[in-house]
Swiss-Prot record:
Binding residues annotated for 1-deoxy-D-xylulose 5-phosphate, in chain numbering: G157, A183, G184, A205, S206
Subunit structure: Homotetramer. Forms heterodimers with either ThiH or ThiS.
Cellular compartments per GO CC: cytoplasm
Lineage: Bacteria, Bacillati, Actinomycetota, Actinomycetes, Mycobacteriales
UniProt EC number: 2.8.1.10
Family membership noted in the UniProt record: Belongs to the ThiG family.
UniProt name for this protein: Thiazole synthase
Function recorded in the entry: Catalyzes the rearrangement of 1-deoxy-D-xylulose 5-phosphate (DXP) to produce the thiazole phosphate moiety of thiamine. Sulfur is provided by the thiocarboxylate moiety of the carrier protein ThiS. In vitro, sulfur can be provided by H(2)S.
Amino acid sequence: MLHIADKTFDSHLIMGTGGATSQALLEESLVASGTQLTTVAMRRHQATTSSGESIFAMLRRLEIALLPNTAGCRTARDAVLTAQLAREALDTNWVKVEVIADEHTLLPDTVELLDACELLVHDGFTVLAYTSDDPITASRLEDCGVAAVMPLGSPIGTGLGILNPHNIELICSRASVPVILDAGVGTASDATLAMELGCDGVLLASAINRAQNPVAMAKSMFHAVEAGRLAAQAGRIPQRQHAVASSSFEGLASWAEQVL
């Protein structure tokens, strides 16, 4: 179970809607992923498609909870206004907060992010904060009262995987709120590693929506997250510099040398 604030989800995979080539394919991928929570960028999404059904209506039909985000915002003020708009339009106080430093790297502006999160928490929002892989920033966000910290594995859309696994593991070991890896996942093994490092969940969009076969990739991500979670719970063996035999040498037969 994934517990965030006052909600519980069976799935540890959160899927984003960005990059989907069609709403029909997005729907198939959402179902295949098993996700119960999905992000929608308030500034970018076309509310109604040619099929006549809005993405919001589709998510309600699929019984998938909606997580609006502040993608594209460059300042704390923009993020706060976007979150307030989402609350009025969608009747939810949940928001994924993104404040981007520049359009080339899409890396978080942690100064503006901290300001935005503090204001939104004070305004009654349940905040999930997209941040860098810096453990200190993650701690500061937790001090602000966010419901989850969402460190990046690598820059958005790069598919480079987890570039600094040590920092992700450190964030997980220190956090008292859920840690959800967000951004940079390229394939199933990246999602598995995130869970093995101690993450409570994985959020991804491009890895599925821009894959050659999005539905097949969604299925693989479902199994990858579950495999990583089970491995983390099981506990890996220690890494060693020298070999350790799996079978004991005790009890081996002792053969006397025969003289010919």
